[in-house]
């Protein structure tokens, strides 16, 4: 009798373990980790992905990270007379928890973003100028726009509050198979609607005036994304959040996060250009034929290749930016036509010709940054004094009136245009680049899953392009790759996560 009971208990225990392994990620039986993972692109997305993949798959996985240019990607710097200045992504929001965690884990130092007073120029006059006094700024804003600035702040806060849910989801290891499903999990149909409507349409419907949109909102879009209020409403909200106080940067340059993550992930950097990726059947050391991805790349004039279990593409699939070909996939990998915005960053060390913007004497000008409206005939999007990446404080007052100014423009500035902007200048350096997507809603985001074990990070940029967005996309892709490798389907695309996790508190 005792033997029968023991066998029955043993059978029930076995059944329970089987059921648990099918439905419980904590108790699930894990597959052996992959042997090799390739990541293409060593910007913030690629290096973040390497960091998270190492955390999930463990120390024995070999991770190769391909980069044809410098580690850091679009987090580039420019040199002016021996000093480095941020060329692109320069400020980080205090609620960007991924970037904050990276800086803490890597032991990096931070600096507060350059301050100073800001003005808005409409092509004829400064329609708004900041004051050193907070109460004066409030009076100016209320006098000109009523309480629209307060309403705008509340609108952005509401979007950010919902967006912050992603950190809780990812802390519980939940992943999403598409950008749309990720956004829907955060803000439901409202967030998807924002992706498919212009910022202008959204804010007009909310009752904001044309004057406020042209003078307060459009200039922010022009400086952050080189575009107008015709961008989608979601990226518009992300852009407006960058107007908050408490913005910061990494001392020494934001690109140090990328090199730090690369080192922390113990990945192998391959300084080469990936030419194509092809799925092939290969016999592994176990003796079983396995589907793998052959990555063919070029170092100098030499062409090489290697095989990988998982591949993450962390560079825009744009012919002008990566030019990767996908060979012999069935079905074929979809081609994306995500155009990227051409922008030119120019750094000039010189004395600003303030008479362009104001009739006040040069010593009474007082503004550190000037943004422009859409209907401005001026050939720049913005101009502002910048600190080098090593400076912990704002630049000291100049004894000769010269500062380093950063200018964003749609086209390369001519010498005549620089001479119009400056009374005199000592040095000028420019960087034309494809900095972020050209937003034209409705937006259809590229797939995250390109093939069985082939993933694409940069589709998140169709919603919004920012350092934090890339880090979040990298974490999501790493979780997605891990769960799909281990067949944890219950950790992907789960409905009702907000309510579910709220009840677990």
From Swiss-Prot:
This is Prenylcysteine oxidase 1. Residues 1-27 form the signal peptide. It comes from Pongo abelii (Sumatran orangutan). Keywords: FAD, Flavoprotein, Glycoprotein, Lysosome, Oxidoreductase, Signal. It comes from the Eukaryota. The gene is PCYOX1. GO terms for molecular function: farnesylcysteine lyase activity; prenylcysteine oxidase activity. It catalyses: an S-polyprenyl-L-cysteine + O2 + H2O = a polyprenal + L-cysteine + H2O2; S-(2E,6E)-farnesyl-L-cysteine + O2 + H2O = (2E,6E)-farnesal + L-cysteine + H2O2; [(2E,6E,10E)-geranylgeranyl]-L-cysteine + O2 + H2O = (2E,6E,10E)-geranylgeranial + L-cysteine + H2O2. Its EC number is 1.8.3.5. Its main location: other. Prenylcysteine oxidase that cleaves the thioether bond of prenyl-L-cysteines, such as farnesylcysteine and geranylgeranylcysteine. Only active against free prenylcysteines and not prenylcysteine residues within prenylated proteins or peptides. Involved in the final step in the degradation of prenylated proteins, by degrading prenylcysteines after the protein has been degraded. Glycans are attached at residues 196, 323, 353. PANTHER family: FARNESYLCYSTEINE LYASE (PTHR15944), PRENYLCYSTEINE OXIDASE 1 (PTHR15944:SF3). InterPro entries: FAD/NAD-bd_sf, Prenylcys_lyase, Prenylcysteine_Oxase1.
